[in-house]
């Protein structure tokens, strides 16, 4: 069975969202449905329809999060023995050999990825190209705009 790699921080964030949806959002939606029922005919009641739609999306998200947490494998970067290679959870500083621009990224699970915050998904082309590589290695990354060469400058395990 395939598992979903996740950092401890990512799992905690999902658990917090799940708690909010179950304990707060659900009761807010139930209250909205109850109030909307008082407006009469449910077939032509826009407030009721909107509340039922919110309920559907909320329950769908709850199921999605529960499934992800059930199938996740929380990876603690500090316990990974490969201290000289790029692995899930490591923070990497790379240099684009064409533009000479340096960037630092952390490889995280799909749900945690946020490119603006330099958090890249384990399933991204950049991560896939970096996994298993060592400091000072040059890697070719296939991107939609062509192959880009990067040099790995530093690997941190934070």
UniProtKB/Swiss-Prot annotation:
Domain of life: Bacteria
Cited InterPro entries: GreA/GreB_C_sf, TF_GreA/GreB_CS, Tscrpt_elong_fac_GreA, Tscrpt_elong_fac_GreA/B, Tscrpt_elong_fac_GreA/B_C, Tscrpt_elong_fac_GreA/B_fam, Tscrpt_elong_fac_GreA/B_N, Tscrpt_elong_fac_GreA/B_N_sf
Gene Ontology terms describing biological process: DNA-templated transcription elongation; regulation of DNA-templated transcription elongation
Keyword Cell division: no
Recorded GO MF terms: DNA binding; RNA polymerase binding
Keyword DNA-binding on entry: yes
UniProt keyword annotations, A-Z: DNA-binding, Transcription, Transcription regulation
NCBIfam families noted in UniProt: greA, PRK00226.1-2, PRK00226.1-4, PRK00226.1-5
Function description: Necessary for efficient RNA polymerase transcription elongation past template-encoded arresting sites. The arresting sites in DNA have the property of trapping a certain fraction of elongating RNA polymerases that pass through, resulting in locked ternary complexes. Cleavage of the nascent transcript by cleavage factors such as GreA or GreB allows the resumption of elongation from the new 3'terminus. GreA releases sequences of 2 to 3 nucleotides.
Annotated protein name in UniProt: Transcription elongation factor GreA
Organism: Wigglesworthia glossinidia brevipalpis
Gene from which the chain derives: greA
